[in-house]
Amino acid sequence: MTPAEFRAAVAAVLAPLNDDWATHAGPVDAITPPAFICTWADPWLIPIAVCSYQARLAVICAAARLDPEPGYEQLEQMVAAALPALQASAIPFVQVAGVAPFECGALQYQAARLICRSPVTLPEVTP
């Protein structure tokens, strides 16, 4: 699996969870919450063998504009739906990072980060 295929696989698992939740397979410049945004975590790639890496993907669960009450409950629902779906699809998650502001399109959103991991191989690049 390549890194792009890993991102697409995670997005495909999350997309059908709720018709009201948008799913983005990569970074975007604006969102309408609630939304899942797949972006690379830090560290992104960890070497595990020759030409083989463990990729770490952050699924940002952006629940609502930065406002404690409605966003927090929505955020908990998103995480509660995403974790079993990822487990059922055999995509291991490492951790759920604490709630923190997430900026997109010059707006602040209440968000959590689900960190997933998968072995990947980098595609060959021809000059």
Map each language-model feature to its residues.
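Charged, amphipathic alpha-helical segments and their flanking helix caps
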Residues: 1-30, 40-127
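Broad, structure-driven detector of short, well-ordered beta-strand segments within folded domains
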Residues: 36-38
